């Protein structure tokens, strides 16, 4: 399992999800607004908006918040958010990709650069690390939707490329361009997914020790705490022993 996925599980176990709920809703609302602005404000006619709303619902975002975010896209005085990607290296030479939605590129770039520097890393040029990742679709389901064999069969039928099942749930990987169709096919068989999103999947992972893992987790946590940052991806790998100690 890649380090960032392990980090997400650790944060969940430590109960940090509740403290960042408001921030998470804000990020989900921003994605809904941008998706609605980029196409039609009707989720049945706008695949990106449909998935953004689906992900918001999966996180129990109130219906009023979702509707308000959609309406905000048509507002004359609404903020104009720009999609920006930053790439760099964290401690131990680990590759990191940061996706942001910002109304001020200079502010966001300055904050991201400062965060990398303070963590002992460095921000690079666009393209400096993304060549070692593949952009794919990731569809997740709770473990309760079925056993590994049933989910694997449904995923193959839907046109997915890979499936990972464990006690935390099922993660299905598909081609980025196929994400909308695959998610629809899976929904017909397994029901609505917990999340459907495009991710940067590392082609190879870099093993790190406990000290480096702690530094990287702090870097990721600080980046994700930035209001403009939507997603952070990395290619580090942590052993089960180290993960157990970090989870304690």
Curated annotation (Swiss-Prot):
Q: Please state the span of the N-terminal signal peptide per the UniProt entry.
A: none
Which HAMAP family does this UniProt record tie to the protein? Answer: Transcrip_reg_TACO1
Keywords, comma-separated and alphabetical: Cytoplasm, DNA-binding, Transcription, Transcription regulation
> Where is this chain primarily localised?
cytoplasm
Organism annotation? Allorhizobium ampelinum (strain ATCC BAA-846 / DSM 112012 / S4)
Subcellular location(s): the record lists:
Cytoplasm
Return the similarity comment.
Answer: Belongs to the TACO1 family.
Q: Name one GO cellular component term.
A: cytosol
What biological-process GO terms show up in the record? regulation of DNA-templated transcription
Any one Pfam family match given in the protein's UniProt record, by short name: TACO1_YebC_N
DNA-binding recorded as keyword: yes
Q: What is this protein called?
A: Probable transcriptional regulatory protein Avi_3631
Q: Which InterPro entries match?
A: Integrase-like_N, TACO1_YebC-like_2nd/3rd_dom, TACO1_YebC_N, Transcrip_reg_TACO1-like, Transcrip_reg_TACO1-like_dom3, YebC-like
GO molecular function (one): DNA binding
């Amino acid at each position: 399992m890649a380090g960032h996925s392990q980090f997400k599980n650790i944060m969940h176990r430590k109960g940090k999800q509740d403290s960042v709920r408001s921030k998470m809703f804000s990020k989900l609302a921003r994605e809904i607004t941008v998706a609605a602005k980029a196409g039609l404000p009707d989720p049945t006619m706008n695949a990106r908006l449909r998935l953004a709303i689906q992900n918001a619902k999966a996180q129990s975002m109130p219906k009023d918040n979702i509707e308000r975010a959609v309406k905000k896209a048509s507002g004359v005085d609404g903020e104009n958010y720009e999609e920006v990607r930053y790439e760099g290296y964290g401690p131990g030479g680990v590759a990191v990709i940061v996706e942001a939605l910002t109304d001020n590129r200079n502010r966001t770039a300055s904050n991201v650069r400062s965060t990398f520097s303070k963590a002992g890393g460095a921000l690079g040029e666009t393209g400096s690390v993304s060549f070692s990742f593949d952009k794919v679709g990731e569809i997740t389901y709770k473990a309760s939707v079925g056993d590994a064999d049933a989910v694997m069969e449904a995923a193959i039928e839907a046109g997915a490329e890979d499936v990972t099942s464990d006690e935390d749930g099922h993660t299905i990987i598909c081609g980025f361009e196929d994400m909308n169709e695959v998610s629809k096919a899976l929904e017909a068989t397994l029901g609505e997914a917990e999340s459907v999103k495009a991710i940067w999947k590392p082609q190879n992972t870099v093993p790190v020790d406990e000290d480096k893992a702690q530094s990287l987790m702090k870097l990721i946590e600080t980046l994700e705490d930035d209001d403009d940052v939507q997603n952070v991806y990395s290619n580090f790998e942590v052993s089960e022993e180290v993960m157990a100690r970090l989870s304690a």
